[in-house]
């Protein structure tokens, strides 16, 4: 055989004899392996065979098998010489590569572009050659697949055999089960038969007792007869002895008598008389035989008496058992009767309460109707007052125009008009009002001229003070001037809210006002021109206490310097057109909202708003929609959204908080924080975080949000929180804000719904949870609020709660839930879900140290009312008879003993426990059909089927989403039997005890 390294061209270099010697040496193998019908098409194209030769090889009747046809083909090719050998080898290369390698020692490497010179090369030939190669590869692949399928078939056959064996075992078990059922039924019938026999034996026993009494009476009569017979026998013996003695005596005395025959006859007669007196021997034998029979019957009666006594003892024992059962049945009957009576009393009490509630409901309906009527009347009055305010505002604008015209006249004319007491309109003054130190010390005050007093008193009648005070008015009727002045004076001393001197209200000296005294210290004002405002900030020149001078520029100077009390909240009313273009804010819910920059020349700048001023509340009622919001504990995003809506006349309640502003700036410069926001949320959906910088979040994960305006709007910056230490981890990034997250939640729910409609699979024990369905009640305040829907706002509602960061909208799905941490020191109670699995596990856990069932307590009606009023009732216990409740005292007593209380309550009781500052550990055991079969024995003890367990598990899984806390879930593939599940539950309880407890923070 040639070497493997030789090329195909070496075959053409060989001579004819060498080639045919190679093939003849392997002729036997070639003839057995090749199929002539596959080789002849190629040989015909190579022109070494003609059509007649092909028909002769394939259809000659002399060639009866394939070996003969292959041999004849070789003989024909041998006549063709070298070309026949080369063409045959090339055909073997395509159709029998292993034979080609055996003959030539070369690998069958097919080069489609290099055929031998025996046939014309064309694209069709190359294509056919390629097709042959691909078909050979497919054939090899199919052979491999066939082998794999054969092995798979063998494995399946083995599995089938095992399954058949298992089925036979199951059939055997079923047969045994049916046999045991039949045996149990037979035993049951046997027990019934034995009971019947026992009853019949008791009847026989009573009959035997009667027979015993009869036999005893008969025995006594026989004994009496025997006694009489004995007495008669003794009497006869005595008579016979006496007769013998008399006979002997008579014989001795009559021995000498001669007449012995006569004596003998006499004795015989006497003997016959005696025999007549005594019994005959036959009668005696009869009496002895009857006596023996009586003794035998007596022995039988004694034995029967003993057996009847034993039966009597057994019957007495059974009678005592039946008596005890009767006593227990009577006791249960009494308990049931008492429970029925208590239930009847409870139903009567509930019916009475329902009647009272119906009465209260009717009263509430009537009160609601009256309140609605009052509200509608108040709204009508408010609308009329608002129209009056608009009319007065127009009058104020006209008066301001007149003041500017009068101000343009020379000062001499102004003084002359002042002497003649004519009204002198001046340019709009800025009223500066501040709290003074020791205001009572300045007792003297000079009055301005009567001309200015008359002017300012006329202006006060139509001044915009009514517009400003209308914000404070609690009554729909407009207040009088004196009440307004009195209210202004009382604001300084009593209320924490004080009006600033920056209100745009032209006022004169309070001494000219009706009802005001010249020395009233509460009305220290300083009328300044707009041009003199910068000088006011640098210095305040006091005037003499005797009089109040008016400078040439028309500035009414203050009597003495004053200082502002920084802790007071000041209300500023001004024209806030596009308020966020006038000011920029920083801060958040942790630090408060501060003014950071003020646009020079804006209305906010004219109102002396400066960086570092904290905004407490915004009141925007000048136009629709109306709102009033507290900004002390709101996030930066919400504050920006609120202030962006302000576009017109508004009121800002502000206070100076320099220390807080400086600390915030230091944290921002040191990059300790990016804003003043800080709160914790629970994420109710899974987010992948595909973009760069986004945080990948799982459902039910707790995050610490530190910035709600991170890199602009639309996203928050959050840190993942350590479950054990509550510290921020290194994993941080951006998450969508509330509105975007809500859209993602809706889209995710829609996708899941479409997938469920296509392939319905049970969710229990499936992959990781993607969505937690949490909805909020629109009647309550949202737990977190980000922005406001203009179409949904109520004008009369006060917006802004310390925990309200979320948006109001028509959608009630909650993507984020505001949570707060707790660290309980004592062992927490344990609540297992589903409840059926919890009951099975509680029986095992209560046997271990550190676990104990929390039993329901029996409470009387008075105790129940007292405990319920204190809020110490958790849930009614599942005990027959009622009035058994799971109480706070029972749970806390176990917690004080350093023991985990095993609770058997519903999931809605978790909210009740949280109100008691008790935070249970909720363990959810995922159950599917396979796992339910492993709990079959425990379910049978509870009287529950597998289908009922699966249905209850599906219902309670839905209730888990509404629970106000996190829970630990155990996958069904994490345990194989009840002991494995018990160890998993213990490990989960120990792990949850170490973690921080996160509960939902309800709105205040």
Swiss-Prot record:
Q: Reply yes or no: does the keyword Phosphoprotein apply.
A: yes
Q: Where is this region: Maintains the protein in an inactive state?
A: 409-568
| Tissue note | Isoform 1 is detected in placenta and epidermal keratinocytes. Isoform 2 is detected in leukocytes and fetal brain.
User: Carries keyword Coiled coil?
Assistant: yes
Pfam annotation, one family:
CARD
Q: What is known of its domains?
A: A linker region between the coiled-coil and PDZ region holds the protein in an inactive state.
Q: What Gene Ontology molecular function terms does this protein carry? A: CARD domain binding
- State the protein's purpose: Acts as a scaffolding protein that can activate the inflammatory transcription factor NF-kappa-B and p38/JNK MAP kinase signaling pathways. Forms a signaling complex with BCL10 and MALT1, and activates MALT1 proteolytic activity and inflammatory gene expression. MALT1 is indispensable for CARD14-induced activation of NF-kappa-B and p38/JNK MAP kinases. May play a role in signaling mediated by TRAF2, TRAF3 and TRAF6 and protects cells against apoptosis.
Show where the PDZ domain sits: 568-658
**What clinical condition does the entry mention?**
Psoriasis 2: A common, chronic inflammatory disease of the skin with multifactorial etiology. It is characterized by red, scaly plaques usually found on the scalp, elbows and knees. These lesions are caused by abnormal keratinocyte proliferation and infiltration of inflammatory cells into the dermis and epidermis. Pityriasis rubra pilaris: A rare, papulosquamous skin disease characterized by the appearance of keratotic follicular papules, well-demarcated salmon-colored erythematous plaques covered with fine powdery scales interspersed with distinct islands of uninvolved skin, and palmoplantar keratoderma. Most cases are sporadic. The rare familial cases show autosomal dominant inheritance with incomplete penetrance and variable expression. Familial PRP usually presents at birth or appears during the first years of life and runs a chronic course.
Question: What PROSITE patterns does UniProt report for this protein, alphabetically?
Answer: CARD, GUANYLATE_KINASE_2, PDZ
According to the record's subunit comment, the protein's assembly and interactions are: Interacts (via CARD domain) with BCL10 (via CARD domain). Forms a complex with MALT1 and BCL10; resulting in the formation of a CBM (CARD14-BLC10-MALT1) complex. Interacts with TRAF2, TRAF3 and TRAF6.
Q: What is this protein called?
A: Caspase recruitment domain-containing protein 14
- Species of provenance: Homo sapiens
Q: Which residues carry this modification: Phosphoserine?
A: 544
């Amino acid at each position: 055989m040639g070497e493997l390294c030789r090329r195909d061209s070496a075959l053409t270099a060989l001579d004819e004899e060498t080639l045919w010697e190679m093939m003849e040496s392997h002729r036997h193998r070639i003839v057995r392996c090749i199929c002539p019908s596959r080789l002849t098409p190629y040989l015909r194209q190579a022109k070494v065979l003609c059509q007649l030769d092909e028909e002769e090889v394939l259809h000659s009747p002399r060639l009866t098998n394939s070996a003969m046809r292959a041999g004849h083909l070789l003989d024909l090719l041998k006549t063709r010489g070298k070309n026949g050998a080369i063409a045959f080898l090339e055909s073997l290369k395509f159709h029998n590569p292993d034979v080609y390698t055996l003959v030539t020692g070369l690998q069958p490497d097919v080069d489609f572009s290099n055929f031998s010179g025996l046939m014309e090369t064309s694209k069709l030939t190359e294509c056919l050659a390629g097709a042959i190669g691909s078909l050979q590869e497919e054939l090899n692949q199919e052979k491999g697949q066939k082998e794999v399928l054969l092995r798979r078939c063998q494995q399946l056959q083995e599995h089938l055999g095992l399954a058949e064996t298992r089925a036979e075992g199951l059939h055997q078990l079923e047969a045994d089960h049916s046999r045991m059922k039949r045996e149990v039924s037979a035993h049951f019938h046997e027990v019934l038969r034995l009971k019947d026999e026992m009853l019949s034996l008791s009847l026989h026993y009573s009959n035997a007792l009667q027979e015993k009494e009869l036999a005893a009476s008969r025995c006594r009569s026989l004994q009496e007869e025997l006694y009489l017979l004995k007495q008669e026998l003794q009497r006869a013996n005595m008579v016979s002895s006496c007769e013998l003695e008399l006979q002997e005596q008579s014989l001795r005395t009559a021995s000498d008598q001669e007449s012995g025959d006569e004596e003998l006859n006499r004795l015989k007669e006497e003997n016959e008389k005696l025999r007549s007196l005594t019994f005959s021997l036959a009668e005696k034998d009869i009496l002895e035989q009857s006596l023996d029979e009586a003794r035998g019957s007596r022995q039988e009666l004694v034995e029967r008496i003993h057996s009847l006594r034993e039966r009597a003892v057994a019957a007495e024992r059974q009678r005592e058992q039946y008596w005890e059962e009767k006593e227990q049945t009577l006791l249960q009957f009494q308990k049931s009767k008492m429970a029925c009576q208590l239930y009847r009393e409870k139903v009567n009490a509930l019916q009475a309460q329902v009647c009272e509630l119906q009465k209260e409901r009717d009263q509430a309906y009537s009160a609601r109707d009256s309140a609605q009527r009052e509200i509608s009347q108040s709204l009508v009055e408010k609308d009329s007052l608002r129209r009056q305010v608009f009319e007065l505002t127009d009058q104020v604008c006209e008066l301001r125009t007149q003041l500017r015209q009068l101000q343009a006249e020379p000062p001499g004319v102004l003084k002359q008009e002042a002497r003649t007491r004519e009204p002198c309109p001046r340019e709009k003054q800025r009223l500066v009002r501040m709290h003074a130190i020791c205001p009572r010390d300045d007792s003297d005050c000079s009055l301005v001229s009567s001309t200015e007093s008359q002017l300012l008193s006329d202006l006060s009648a139509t001044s915009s003070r009514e517009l400003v005070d209308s914000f404070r008015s609690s009554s729909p009727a407009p207040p009088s001037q004196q009440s307004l002045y009195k209210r202004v004076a009382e604001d300084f001393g009593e209320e924490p809210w004080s009006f600033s001197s920056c209100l745009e209200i032209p006022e004169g000296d309070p001494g000219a006002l009706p009802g005001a005294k010249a020395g009233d210290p509460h009305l220290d004002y300083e009328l300044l021109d707009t041009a003199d405002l910068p000088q006011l900030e640098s210095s305040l020149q006091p005037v003499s206490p005797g009089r109040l001078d008016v400078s040439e520029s028309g500035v009414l100077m203050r009597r003495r310097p004053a200082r502002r009390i920084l802790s007071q909240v000041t209300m500023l009313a001004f024209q806030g057109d596009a308020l966020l273009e006038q000011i920029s804010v920083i801060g958040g819910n942790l630090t408060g909202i501060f003014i950071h920059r003020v646009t020079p020349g804006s209305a906010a700048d004219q109102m002396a708003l400066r960086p570092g001023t904290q905004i407490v509340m915004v009141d925007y009622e000048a136009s629709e929609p109306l709102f009033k919001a507290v900004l002390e504990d709101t996030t930066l995003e919400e504050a920006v959204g609120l202030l962006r809506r302000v576009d017109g006349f508004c009121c800002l309640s502000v206070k100076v908080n320099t220390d807080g502003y400086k600390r915030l700036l230091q944290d921002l410069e040191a990059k300790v924080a990016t804003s003043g926001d800080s709160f914790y949320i629970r994420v109710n959906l899974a987010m992948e975080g595909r973009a760069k910088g986004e945080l990948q979040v799982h459902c039910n994960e707790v995050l610490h949000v530190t910035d709600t305006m991170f890199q602009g709007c639309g996203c928050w910056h959050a840190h993942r929180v350590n479950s054990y230490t509550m510290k921020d981890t290194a994993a941080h990034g951006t998450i969508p804000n509330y509105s975007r997250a809500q859209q993602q939640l809706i889209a995710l729910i829609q996708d899941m719904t479409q997938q469920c409609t296509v392939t319905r699979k049970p969710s229990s024990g499936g992959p990781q949870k993607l969505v937690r369905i949490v909805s909020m009640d629109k009647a309550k305040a949202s737990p977190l609020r980000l922005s406001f829907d203009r179409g949904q706002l109520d004008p009369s509602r006060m917006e802004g709660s310390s925990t309200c960061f979320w948006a109001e909208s028509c959608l009630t799905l909650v993507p984020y839930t505001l949570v707060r941490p707790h660290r309980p020191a004592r062992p927490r109670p344990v609540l297992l879900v589903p409840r059926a699995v919890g009951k099975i596990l509680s029986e095992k856990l209560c046997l271990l140290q550190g676990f104990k069932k929390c039993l329901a307590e029996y409470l009387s009606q008075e105790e129940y009312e007292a405990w319920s009023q204190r809020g110490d009732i958790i849930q009614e216990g599942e005990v027959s008879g009622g009035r058994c409740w799971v109480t706070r005292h029972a749970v806390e007593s176990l917690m004080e003993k350093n023991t985990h209380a095993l609770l058997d309550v519903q999931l809605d009781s978790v909210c009740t426990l949280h109100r008691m500052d008790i935070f249970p550990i909720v363990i959810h055991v995922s159950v599917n059909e396979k796992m339910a079969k492993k709990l079959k024995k425990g379910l049978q003890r509870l009287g529950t089927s597998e289908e009922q367990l699966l249905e209850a598990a599906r219902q309670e899984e839905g209730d888990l989403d509404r629970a106000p806390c996190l829970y630990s879930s155990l996958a069904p593939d994490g345990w194989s039997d009840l002991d494995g599940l018990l160890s998993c539950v213990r490990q989960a309880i120990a792990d949850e005890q170490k973690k921080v407890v996160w509960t939902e923070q309800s709105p205040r």
